[in-house]
Amino acid sequence: MPSFDIVSEIDEVALRHAVENANRELSTRFDFRGVEASIAQNGLAVTLKTESDFQVRQLEELFTKACLKQNISAAGADKPEELEHSGKTFSLTLTFRQGIDQPVAKQIVKLIKESKIKVQASIQGDQVRVNGKKRDDLQAVMALLRESKIETPLQFNNFRD
């Protein structure tokens, strides 16, 4: 019986490349000349630091573009409501999540069941397994999830026929 897994994973190497590319572009940007600005990575957390809150937002946009070039969705990152302010620096810490948390997994299963596609979806830890009799049904589920308004970036892997 064909099946596949729905997961949400961030490749740390690709994230590091995105940070390095954003830092490289930061060093050439005219609006950041003479300003202390940096993008640093610690595991799945990325910290953006600069001297004003407006520049932090610009830095966030710059980093988001670098992430998209590496096929990482920055929308899946946890971002605090307010910027951290200490001394003369403002900082923003983006924390990327690994795996699908329980409420999102339940939302995915509910969405699949409401679509009336003849497949079974089950939550297995931090991923969702989808089983069906036909490959076409599984591909319909993939298309449905790509078009859905789920905040978490999803990947499909372990496709078995």
UniProtKB/Swiss-Prot annotation:
Keywords, ordered alphabetically = Nucleotide-binding
Identify one Gene Ontology CC term for this UniProt entry: cytosol
Please tell me whether the keyword Nucleotidyltransferase is annotated for this protein. Answer: no
Q: Which SUPFAM superfamilies match?
A: YajQ-like
Database matches in InterPro entries? DUF520, UPF0234-like_C, UPF0234_N, YajQ-like_sf
Q: Which GO terms describe its molecular function?
A: nucleotide binding
Q: Record's Pfam families?
A: DUF520
Biological function: Nucleotide-binding protein.
Q: What family is reported?
A: Belongs to the YajQ family.
Report the PANTHER family cross-referenced here: UPF0234 PROTEIN YAJQ
Report the protein name in the record: Nucleotide-binding protein ABO_0048
Which organism was this protein described from? Alcanivorax borkumensis (strain ATCC 700651 / DSM 11573 / NCIMB 13689 / SK2)
